[in-house]
């Protein structure tokens, strides 16, 4: 395999989704870390520079607007990190707030992995 494309953090409380995303992105050349909960993601962000964070908006114990904390935390600690939010329950209000806080992409689940990869690659090229 050639050079790695960058470092990616995947945040999702569903282990099957976390595993599938991690395996897919590793397979196309990314270095991948993953977190199951908000606190774990924040700890990783505090000590590691990521090219992109892909986070589920709803984690265990985190719902609605509270799920946007990952955007604020990422922007505060690592302004250069691109943030992609995934959700199965989008509302126009939450999407607008996510974008206002600095989310680079707000995507509806399910999303084909090649399409997600293309979005991530585009964000990295833009930065």
Language-model segments: which ranges?
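Conserved acidic carboxylate
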Residues: 12
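The short loop immediately C-terminal to the conserved phospho-acceptor aspartate in CheY-like receiver
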Residues: 58-61
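Short amphipathic alpha-helix used as the core "switch/output" element in two-component signaling
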Residues: 43, 65-79
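C-terminal output helix
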Residues: 93, 111-120
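Alpha4 helix (beta4-alpha4-beta5 surface) of REC/receiver domains from two-component response regulators
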Residues: 65, 69, 90-107
